[in-house]
Amino acid sequence: MVLKFGTFRLKINIEREVFCLFINSVMIIDMIRIFTGNTMVTNLCRNGIYLLILFFVCMDACNKKRVNNLLGMGILYIVFALFSLLVNGSDVNSLLLSGSMIFISRCLVGFYLARNIQIDEGLWNSIKKYYVLVIVYCIVYANMGSLDQYGMREGYMTFSYNILIPTTLILIMMIQRQQGRVLKLIISTFLTIQLIVMGARGPVACMAVSIIIFIWIQLAQFPLYKKLIACGAFSLAAILVYFARDEILDYMLSINSTSRTLILLKNGNLFDLSNRNSYYEILIEEIKRNIILPHGLYADRVILNQNFSGSSAISGQYAHNLFFEILYQFGGVFGGAILFAFFIKVYKSIKHLELINNQIITAFYCAFATGLISLLFSSSYLINERAWLFIGIVFAFSNIKYLTLKSNG
């Protein structure tokens, strides 16, 4: 699309710009919250941004005859939602209402955008512009964010998930590309420190696993001697970090002494489940009791709300684990089949990435994988748009012909 201002012309790829806006939308909304401190203004901006993106997606789907991409997932969701309403009755009314709005305006939109976006140098150039905003967001949060009753910085989990994809993406791009490596190193180091020092432990784990996936894909292209050298280098780095762990921790705690991640690490409680094991035990027993019949969407909230109280994804308590959530909602047999089919697609997409060997596509794939990884211990697939970005890419990349078209531009 070309915009004209007198004699000035500006060529814009609308699909690409909307995709980049969507990826950074939660961060932008949180910045508005911090600056204004006004819930009504924040909600208006949030609704405006997501409605604008949803409008673009609907128009794009109609113009490019991609309506089936939306209808397929949309119809499946409606069918499962109606089944849940039939099984659970009024217990899921409010959950379905608020959850459906989020699923349609964010998750389904994220799936569509990622399923159809052209991942190339142009997309990387478009997303690079947002790193100035990401850095400003980190500075604003560190200096303007308020503390809660426990002395922790409010919204630290939201903050860390907001910068997770940009941090992982630029870190991978820094590793694999020599051009502009010094600047990428500075930015990725700054963002990684912010993620660890100011954020939650979950996003740090997501980034670490994503980097491991990236290394695995890259090593597949190396001859044996290079694989041995790489493994030796990573092992040496891990040993050095281990022996210098106390000094590193003390330095990071000097930056933010209230960091929950660093305090847990210092006290040896980094892998504490924070009562998640209680949720898992209840869901496991319920799945064993009725392994065939499904319970319906959001049904894990219903059963856990009967045993616990507190805030969560949408309302009350929730599974905090993709496997338990799917198995309980869809039943052990059907849910297991869904998980098996999906992870077969993930495996195929990774093998196709190895075959294509495209640096930019691999970088985006691994960065978006953080969305799925986070579902193993936090959030819910029904409200997490980052996970649906990855699901969209998996659906696209599990088809080798489609991936080849993306790679060739």
Question: At which residue positions do the language-model features occur?
Answer:
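A membrane-periplasm/extracellular boundary helix in multi-pass inner-membrane enzymes
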Residues: 193, 197, 218-266, 284-285
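Alpha-helical transmembrane segments of multi-pass inner-membrane proteins
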Residues: 116-148, 156-220
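Transmembrane alpha-helices of multi-pass inner-membrane enzymes
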Residues: 54, 170-172, 364-376, 380-409
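Interfacial loop-to-transmembrane-helix boundary motif in multi-pass membrane proteins
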Residues: 16-19, 66-78, 101-104, 111-139, ...
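Long extracytoplasmic/lumenal interhelical loops at the membrane interface
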Residues: 147-150, 267-330
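N-terminal signal-anchor transmembrane segment
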Residues: 1-62, 77-90, 138-143, 373
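Hydrophobic transmembrane alpha-helices and their immediate junctions
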Residues: 66, 329-372, 398
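Aromatic-anchored transmembrane helix interface
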Residues: 44-53, 70-82, 91-115, 156-164
